[in-house]
Amino acid sequence: MDYSLLPTFNAILNASSGILVLLGYRNIKRSNESVHKRFMLSAMGVSAIFFASYLIYHWEVGSVKFQGSGLIRTFYFTLLISHTILAVTIVPMVLRTAYLALKGNFAKHRKIAKFTFPIWIYVSITGVIIYLMLYQL
């Protein structure tokens, strides 16, 4: 199997997840709870597909070495470290935030979502930036 297209596919999934989260946020700000729920559950589904595809790619291909040097290399690894830590952190946060909403505990849902939302957006954006730096520079 040719795995060469998976990094681009993963970046598209990552960007799509971030866009869905932003659309979900916009709809909850407009008090459109049912549309918010659909966007957020869609974002979770896209993120799950991303994660499976990401694992398959790295299982089959291994790690890819960043080719840049100097300040761009420092920037890349700083971004990668923050992205990786927050990507691991966001998974239980998203699951907890969704669980609270699905159980109807909206006070706690809103409280944790204030942290979950910006981290999820950061991870989506930095994931795409890392892809561009690693595969397109």
Show which residues each predicted segment covers.
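Alpha-helical membrane insertion/targeting regions
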Residues: M1-L137
